[in-house]
Structures are given as C-alpha cells and as structure tokens.
C-alpha cells in the first residue's frame, strides 16, 4: 500500500488541477501523511487555507488511541495548518468540552459534530439528535470563541438553519478562558475490586449491559 502522504497528494493534485484553494482533511484518526500533503499544497498554492480535523471519542482519544490535544498541538507547531478541528463520532454535547480544551493551541478551531448518536430503526440508521439541541450546543461554542462551526453525520439543512438562527441571535461576547486538557488516568488494576476478586477466584459474576440513551441531549 502507498504511504498515506502519497495518497493525499495524489488526491490533492486532482483538486489543484481544478483550481481548488481551500482544503479540509477530516475524520482523521491520526496525523499519518497529513503534514506531507499540507506541505505540498502550500508549495503549490501558498495562500491555500487548510483545515485538519480529527474524529475523536468523548474521552478525547481517536480510534487509534491518539489524544486530540497532542494531534492538535502537532498541527499548530507545524506552521502549515490554518485551522484545526474535531468532527464526526461524537454528538455536540460530548464534543463541546473537548473543543474548549483545544482553544489554547493558537489556531482557529473548527467543530463539526454529528447530529447525535446513531440508532437502527427498521434496518435504517438514523440520528435522533434534534436540530434545536444541535444548534444550542454549537452556539455555546461560538460564544466562547470557536470560529468555524458545522455538522457531520446526521445533520440536515434543518440543523444548519437552526444553528444559523442561534448564531444570528448571539450578542458580541468575549471568548472564554481555555480549559487545560487533562489526560485521563489509567485505572489502577491493583486496587481492591470485588468484581476482579471474584473473577480471579473463579466465582460466578453477573454483568449487565445497558442500552445507550435514546436521545443525545443529556441536559
């Protein structure tokens, strides 16, 4: 397989041939090959505007186990990327605290969450997050200084129209102070845990799986 950077550059060439000047690298789980491609774009079009956006779980990690804080910092320190962001995977309420923790990196921030979380209804995947919830959570980020807002999976023109209405109603505000990103602590497997003791002793244990909430609005 070709290195990721070469794949990105091959695709970029097709867009450059059509006169593209704005580029969005999105739903990324790592930075593999990204900066190689961005460097190529900047050499071809020095005033190109490039956004790099990562898909992050609510705990702040990508599916490859990389922390969004570290990825965003690498993009900022490269001096090549014009804006960094988060998109997909998480709903607005879960993405908002992650976005707030990235406001200190020194680049404009892009936030494009899913409408909510997917559910399967009659073999069809649907997102039950309501436009009002999506717009309300996104507008909070705008009030705190996020410059680029949008939507990913499950968002519709109705979601975007609701967001536009919320943004139009916002008064001018001062950006909030950035929140430091803390690294989740690893569990201490040595501590006294009744469940673990029973497993180690070969005793019968009972585990219950709970369905996820039916609505992504946890407020």
Task: Describe the function of each predicted region.
Residues 1-219:
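Domain-level signal for soluble alpha/beta catalytic cores
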């Amino acid at each position: 397989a070709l290195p990721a950077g070469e794949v990105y550059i091959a695709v970029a060439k097709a867009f450059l041939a059509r006169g593209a000047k704005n580029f969005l690298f999105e739903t990324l789980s790592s930075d593999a090959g990204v900066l190689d491609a961005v460097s190529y774009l900047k050499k071809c079009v020095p005033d190109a505007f490039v956004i790099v956006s990562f898909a992050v779980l609510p705990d702040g990690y990508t599916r490859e186990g990389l922390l969004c804080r570290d990825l965003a910092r690498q993009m900022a320190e490269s001096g090549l990327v014009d804006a960094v962001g988060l998109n997909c995977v998480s709903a607005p309420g879960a993405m908002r605290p992650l976005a707030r923790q990235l406001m200190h990196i020194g680049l404009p921030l892009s936030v494009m969450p899913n409408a909510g979380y997917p559910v399967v209804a009659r073999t069809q995947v649907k997102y039950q997050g309501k436009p009002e919830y999506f717009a309300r959570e996104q507008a909070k980020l705008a009030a705190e200084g996020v410059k680029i807002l949008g939507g990913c999976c499950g968002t519709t023109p109705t979601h975007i129209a609701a967001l536009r209405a919320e943004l139009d109603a916002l008064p001018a505000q001062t950006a909030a102070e950035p929140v430091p990103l803390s690294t989740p602590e690893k569990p201490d497997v040595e501590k006294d845990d009744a469940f673990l003791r029973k497993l180690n002793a070969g005793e019968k244990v009972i585990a219950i799986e709970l369905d996820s909430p039916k609505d992504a609005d946890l407020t």
